[in-house]
Design a protein with these regions (language model features):
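Alpha-helical membrane segments of multi-pass proteins
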Residues: 1-208
């Protein structure tokens, strides 16, 4: 539950809470632009965040990480940064920075929603306890919730929270996309293209 909230609710809200001028001045400026263009590359962030989170959630890896506080802190920091970059691509908070168009962002969200399906499905069908650290405290909060059921519930919550956050953002993107296309209706751009009822019409320059 905590992990789902951290990566699929608090991260996008953190980006949205920052003023655009702050992002321009301190996050995306001439000193950081080159590095961020690489680190925040859309398809790299898609693979990096979902790949790292999947590896982190593998029981053997998870147990090793949480036996060392410093390793746990480093892992959380890496996941934090990779989640920020992934949500940056989706939200695109600074309009003048070149990013994916609405169609590609919708595709990006669709692929991101599929990326964690294997590990989420694994937790749902799991039939043995894989996290020794949680076994001593099983049934303390809810008596009928064994460590196995707890793992299965965690997998279900992970997918539900992920899909809910992505679906909400996708609806907002589709709404903005529709408003953008509506604003283009009947206009002619610098490439002599007219937009009429969603149809693109190429005009001769002399007929502009």
């Amino acid at each position: 539950m905590q992990l789902s909230v951290v990566f699929f609710i608090s991260r996008p809200l953190l980006i949205l809470s920052l003023p655009v001028n702050f992002l321009r001045q301190y996050i995306w400026n001439h000193r950081t632009k080159f590095a961020l263009n690489i680190l925040a590359h859309p398809w790299l962030t898609l693979i990096t965040f979902n790949g790292l989170l999947t590896i982190y959630l593998i029981p053997a890896v998870f147990n090793i990480i949480h036996t060392n506080i410093f390793l746990s802190i480093i892992t959380q920091a890496i996941l934090f940064v990779s989640a920020i970059f992934m949500w940056w691509v989706i939200i695109h908070p600074v309009p003048e920075i070149k990013g994916l168009d609405y169609l590609l962002r919708a595709l990006y969200i669709f692929l991101a929603s599929l990326a964690l399906f294997p590990i989420g499905f694994y937790y749902v069908i799991i039939q043995s306890a894989h996290f020794p650290v949680y076994i001593p405290v099983e049934r303390e909060l809810i008596h009928s919730l064994s460590s196995i059921y707890d793992q299965q519930l965690a997998g279900g919550i992970l997918k539900v929270m992920q899909l809910a956050s992505y679906s909400f953002v996708l609806l907002i993107l589709l709404f903005k996309w529709g408003k953008q296309e509506e604003a283009k209706e009947g206009s002619v751009d610098e490439e002599h293209i007219r937009y009429a009822r969603g149809v693109v019409i190429h005009l001769d320059k002399e007929k502009k």
